[in-house]
Amino acid sequence: MAAECGSDSQPRRRRRRDPEEPGKTELSAREPVVAVPQENEEENEERWVGPLPVEATLAKKRKVLEFEKVYLDNLPSASMYERSYMHRDVITHVVCTKTDFIITASHDGHVKFWKKIEEGIEFVKHFRSHLGVIESIAVSSEGALFCSVGDDKAMKVFDVVNFDMINMLKLGYFPGQCEWIYCPGDAISSVAASEKSTGKIFIYDGRGDNQPLHIFDKLHTSPLTQIRLNPVYKAVVSSDKSGMIEYWTGPPYEYKFPKNVNWEYKTDTDLYEFAKCKAYPTSICFSPDGKKLATIGSDRKVRIFRFLTGKLMRVFDESLSMFTELQQMRQQLPDMEFGRRMAVERELEKVDAVRLINIVFDETGHFVLYGTMLGIKVINVETNRCVRILGKQENIRVMQLALFQGIAKKHRAATTIEMKASENPVLQNIQADPTIVCTSFKKNRFYMFTKREPEDTKSADSDRDVFNEKPSKEEVMAATQAEGPKRVSDSAIIHTSMGDIHIKLFPVECPKTVENFCVHSRNGYYNGHTFHRIIKGFMIQTGDPTGTGMGGESIWGGEFEDEFHSTLRHDRPYTLSMANAGSNTNGSQFFITVVPTPWLDNKHTVFGRVTKGMEVVQRISNVKVNPKTDKPYEDVSIINITVK
């Protein structure tokens, strides 16, 4: 976990749009050491009278998972995502099937099918599945059928392998959750759907008509939050908002309580844990052997149960208070970045998006993966340790995960022993490509983490964010209206009270940022502004009409979004960049660096470079300032800015 050391020049809370200063990073490994009493080595004939003295304790031997390295080699390891693809609207759901398909669903009711290939994925088909919001999606245990339910009171059923819609059910109520509850070999392809406002569960034939085969009307008394099939033991687990968890079966066993579990009364289990904590499961999944049941609760705790006994096996606390305490004990992120991520977490709770966060097992059942504010955590369930965090430095809040492991099946001749033993380089190149496909909060993209880091991110030709969607009519109209007379330029001169600074601008890479700067400059907005924050050996900052570091706005009023470009980095001194108070909060303030500041990449928009007048920038950076506020004792101001 990254930590950034502060300094006297670290941004203070009262300032809104200050760039962060350099820091250090280190990995934290907080692990509880469990002590056990040491046995007495000597037995004295004389007994102690009264209480015994405190005995020494020995550290308990750490558990080790055999072949852990082999298992981890079959999981994604890259710290940054390799590729991302688009929908028109925010992506809310993603699943991966055993038939090597990845299916994504967005808020506007659209569903896309993607095929996993030897390296990466390829687009297959696009469906307008629902007229409204998609509430839930599910894929069958063998990967043959897929269904989705939406607030248009309909269920759509798809044949995954042939990527075709094969059935449509009119439900007559607003659905909440759905799940395929049949196993391979069953006569009926049964699917369960819950009513969003009640605890009712309706069972249908996925290939049949609208008439339910069975209705559970007394199993749950509150709206359901999850329905999941355990295909190994042919049992279904459902949960509701009151924290109750129920086991039941499908049509082959007449919808009764499963007989293959090792308990009869729920009081013999730990399944009341959620009700005790006044929480409920927002995600449920099973290990490949069916023996472990992993959940994420509304209280942000990860609980892992033994399925057959219902006993609690592990609890991992991922609550905001835990992260705050961790940050105070040992800094995990720079203060500004930590504050930004905490704000995102609170917004998650405010809009009830926590229910979309899920948890998945790997193919061995020894590891669970889920998204947190620090990135995707990979937890070893056997040793109780976090072995890997993916995407910690990315500017996304990971929500739903789907994990692909193994080698994508391709229509080719079967591999023979002779082919395996041969030294054919083409055959040897066929390797596993473990991939995590994940959605992000308020993003219309899904992201792919693999074992490969992004290709040269400084090359403009290798953009990892694929633009696979055409712009909407509104975006085209906005772009057309914005053209009009030329409002931007590629150079300008900042006339200051200590001399002139010539700058080159990048209107192609950062059109909105350069337009904001040029229009403000032409309108005389920056005239008389002081350099209100100067840090020797770091940067000079200006553009605030109030001179406090808390003012300023864009030419459109308010704030506008970041414009990061792979070729524009803080990799050299005299870089012109936007100051902000977090992601997408650009106004009018900007700064010029006097040293390379790579830690500001992808946090502040670079939109220009100084081409002449570097000595003026250096003189300004060396003026005497108040050590507490970084404000110069004698004002250094902008006279005006000439845009060429």
Curated annotation (Swiss-Prot):
- Region forming the signal peptide: none
Q: Which GO terms describe its biological process?
A: mRNA processing; protein folding; RNA splicing
Can you name one GO molecular function term for this protein? peptidyl-prolyl cis-trans isomerase activity
Which stretches does the entry tag as region Disordered? 1-48
**Which residues get modified to N-acetylalanine?**
2
Domain PPIase cyclophilin-type, chain residue ranges per copy: 488-643
The protein's superkingdom reads: Eukaryota
- Its Enzyme Commission number(s) read 5.2.1.8
The family database entries (SMART domains) matched by this protein are listed as: WD40
Enumerate the WD repeat regions by residue range: 86-124, 129-168, 219-258, 276-317
Alphabetized, the UniProt keywords read: Acetylation, Isomerase, mRNA processing, mRNA splicing, Nucleus, Repeat, Rotamase, Spliceosome, WD repeat
Q: Which GO terms of the cellular component aspect does the record hold? A: catalytic step 2 spliceosome; nuclear body
**Functional note:** PPIase that catalyzes the cis-trans isomerization of proline imidic peptide bonds in oligopeptides and may therefore assist protein folding. May be involved in pre-mRNA splicing.
Q: Which family does it belong to?
A: Belongs to the cyclophilin-type PPIase family. PPIL1 subfamily.
Q: What is this protein called?
A: Peptidylprolyl isomerase domain and WD repeat-containing protein 1
The organism named in the record is: Bos taurus (Bovine)
